Amino acid sequence: AACLFGCQQQDNLQDPSKEAIDFSISIDNQSITDLLTRNSAALSLPVKNSFSTGDVISMSVSNQDYLPFALGVDSQTWDEIDTDVESVTFYAHYPELTDEAATRALGKRYRSIKGGKEHLFGIAQAIRGTKNVALKFKRMTVPVILLDEDGRPYNGKASIKLRLRNRGIQDLFNGKVELDKSAEAEDINIKKVSDGELTNLIPQETIKAGEVIGEVSIEGEKQKIVANQDVEVSAGNAIVMRFARNRVIFDGHTPLRR
């Protein structure tokens, strides 16, 4: 974790409640690290694995409305926090909330969320007056990574579509994304690493063996992708589709037939 975020006014040194809180920000990258270990440690992925000055999150304190917070630019003091409780919980979303969810408090704590983009959620607990607050983020969606049979980013001519449900409901105050049961299956274009961002899926029920879950198109020919065994689609756990000779390997170890 890098401690970037907090500045301090000399005039306020005598009153701790007026000093800016130092926020240290970290992202749980264990699932990505495990993936690279299984496939290629030299693989560089376009995922958010650290924060930089100027990144904007949405932050809520003690279930109050979410407000934009530019890391390393904005500051927060205990004096500005409207709560009398001793143990305070901070909640944060990245990217920032840009719809009506940004102004919803605990009474309306859910929002609809569309698949495709990467979503992270962070939480921290601190005793009121504490100088340092450590926000720890986790991935709430499921990144999909296309590799070739040698474990390198796939840059061939094939295009891949998965046919899954792609809309969820997110709890704004624990970050969890659940599948919207009313959502219909739709075609989801899976981006390549070279596109500069990964396609992220909504967490959903286990894909059952035998299900047709998409298709590969190459030079006008289309072939179905059928799961040979049950496959989990769970938050934070990246899915790898590796193109090997005459087959596709799903998640680094689960074979699919085309």
Locate predicted features.
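Bacterial N-terminal signal peptides
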Residues: 1-3
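Sec-type signal peptide cleavage vicinity
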Residues: 5-258
